[in-house]
């Protein structure tokens, strides 16, 4: 069951506007997975390079075809719109913001509860700001896109507020990974080591901001563990919905933590994957890696013995085992997290790919 399916089953209109990238075959589009409507792209943003590439070879492979912006509604086949090239790349985030605002207004006018999901396509490569923002910061295209995104998110907030829905709307801003790990990327991960496609904190830590006036305390900052999969049971709790009892749900209900009823997160641990590779686990402020990543490329290093980081002592992950010999007891809870996860995979392997 998806988040959109759970919300739809509980009376919410559901719309996605932006990048899907979770399947682009019949039965796997967002409107097959709980969303009522969708406008966006089905694959990754880098495909915008292809139509403008002098070396692109048409017919080289059945899957090596240009991406199109797509639109679909539940119960209908998606339709292809314009080619997703560099020109469209620069304007698509404006378009999906407008689609989302229109969706919100339509549902508000009907007094219908809604779930609007906007997976923006920026700042993945190619980083192409809208013409309205190109050159506005004086600090290059990446900074222009940050300013652009700030404005677009502000428009969404303003829409909610002007419709009188502020107190009744949960607004979340977050990301799915740290900066893109390519030399041309100008993303920034602060003091954290690594980038996307690495097992380090620069990949795992992302911003998470949530607004729900009167329910979630304002101006509160926390360093507690929180995983995006926690949103499923947490949002279900917020709306009083039941979650399935016939399968393992990896997320934990964080409603008490977010609403200030508990200072501690309900999550004690998480597992670290890159693709299908299990790299390690985190438990409280401790981290154990059984594999590491070559930071000059994407080579995987299998460790003869796991590396252990105390992230309170070594937040930059510079010195494995720093002060670790005094605390080898932590091996037991760290290994237990990994064993529990492996048990859950064996006992509930999930839905097979079609």
Language model feature labels by segment:
Residues 1-306, 311, 315-354:
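Formylglycine-dependent sulfatase
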């Amino acid at each position: 069951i998806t988040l959109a399916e759970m919300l739809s089953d509980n009376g919410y209109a559901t719309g996605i506007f932006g990048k899907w990238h979770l399947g682009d075959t019949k039965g796997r589009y967002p409107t097959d997975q709980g969303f009522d409507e969708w406008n966006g792209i089905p694959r990754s943003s880098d495909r915008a390079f292809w139509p403008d590439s002098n070396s692109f070879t048409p017919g080289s492979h059945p899957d090596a075809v240009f991406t199109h912006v797509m639109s679909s509604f539940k119960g209908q086949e998606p339709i292809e719109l314009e080619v997703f090239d560099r020109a469209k790349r620069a304007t698509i985030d404006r378009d999906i913001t407008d689609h989302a605002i229109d969706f919100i207004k339509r549902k508000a006018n009907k007094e219908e509860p809604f779930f609007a999901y906007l997976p923006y396509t920026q700042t993945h490569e190619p980083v192409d700001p809208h013409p309205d923002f190109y050159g506005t910061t004086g600090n290059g295209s990446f900074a222009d896109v940050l300013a652009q995104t700030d404005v677009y998110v502000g428009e969404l907030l303003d829409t909610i507020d002007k419709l009188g829905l502020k107190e009744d709307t949960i607004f979340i801003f977050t990301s799915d990974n740290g900066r893109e790990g390519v030399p041309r990327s100008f993303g920034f991960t602060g003091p954290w080591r690594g980038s996307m496609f690495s097992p380090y904190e620069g990949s795992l830590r992302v911003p998470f901001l949530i607004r729900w006036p009167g329910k979630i305390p304002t101006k509160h900052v926390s360093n507690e563990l929180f995983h995006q999969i926690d949103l499923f049971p947490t949002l279900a709790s917020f709306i009083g919905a039941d979650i399935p009892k016939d399968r393992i749900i990896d997320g934990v209900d964080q409603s008490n933590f977010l609403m200030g009823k508990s200072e501690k997160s309900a999550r004690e641990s998480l597992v670290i994957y890159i693709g299908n590779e299990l790299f390690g686990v985190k438990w409280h402020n401790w981290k154990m890696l059984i594999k590491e990543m070559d930071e000059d490329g994407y080579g995987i290093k299998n460790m003869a013995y796991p590396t252990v980081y105390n992230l309170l002592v070594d937040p930059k992950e510079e010195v494995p085992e720093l002060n670790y010999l005094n605390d080898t007891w932590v091996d037991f809870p760290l290994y237990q997290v990994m064993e529990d996860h492996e048990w859950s995979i064996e006992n509930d392997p999930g839905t097979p790919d079609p």
